[in-house]
Design a protein with these regions (language model features):
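Flexible phosphate/Mg2+-sensing switch loops adjacent to catalytic phosphate-binding sites
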Residues: 62-87, 91, 109-117
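Walker A/P-loop-proximal flanking segment of P-loop NTPase domains
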Residues: 1-52, 58-65
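Conserved catalytic network of the ASCE P-loop NTPase/AAA+ motor domain
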Residues: 38-39, 80-83, 124-128
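Charged C-terminal transducer/switch regions of large nucleotide-driven machines
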Residues: 86-99, 121-125
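Well-ordered, non-membrane alpha-helical segments in soluble/globular domains
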Residues: 26-31, 115-118, 150-152
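Residue-level preference for the first positions of well-ordered beta-strands
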Residues: 43-45, 87, 131-133
Length: 152
């Protein structure tokens, strides 16, 4: 029997039985990402209430980007001519973004070190012919932390 859960963790990925149901809204969001990217927008925000499928959307998007077969949301070639996609997945928490990024990237130092490491990973992916995408899920927690601790 298949179990339904309102929450998904993008770092844990999807199990073999992951079956994303593409709704018209999800298709609109995916099309908006592709159209926006192709017109020069490279950062996107997906918002919605708890349990509406934002994390599952990211998992389905990742699956499409890394799949050679059938695509549910987008055909990766409409986004880039790169043959491979690398996805850096971060789940937000009540911490500053630099700390979350340092932890995920397994580095020490300042926010500048984070930017240097991201630049390095981007360049390495590019050398491999890959397209680097960063997913930050639960970003609202990061914003809440910033508002309470360092609103400037």
């Amino acid at each position: 029997m298949q179990q339904f859960s309102l929450s998904a963790n993008i770092e844990e990925g999807q199990d073999k039985d992951f079956n994303y149901i593409v709704t018209p809204n999800a298709q609109d969001v995916a099309s908006g990402i592709v159209n926006g990217y192709n017109s020069g927008i490279h950062s996107f925000t997906i918002i919605g209430s708890y349990g509406t499928g934002k994390s599952c959307f990211l998992l389905a998007l990742e699956k499409d980007l890394q799949s050679k077969g059938q695509h549910n949301l987008i055909n990766p070639q409409t986004l880039s001519s790169c043959k491979k996609y690398e996805v850096l997945k971060i789940v937000g928490d009540y911490k500053d973004l630099a700390s979350l990024m340092r932890n995920k990237l397994a580095i020490d130092g300042t926010a500048d070190n984070v930017l240097d490491e991201l630049r390095n990973r981007y360049n390495q992916a590019k050398k491999r012919g890959s397209f680097l995408i960063i997913f930050i899920d639960e970003f609202g927690k990061v914003l809440e932390h910033a508002a309470k601790n360092d609103p400037e």
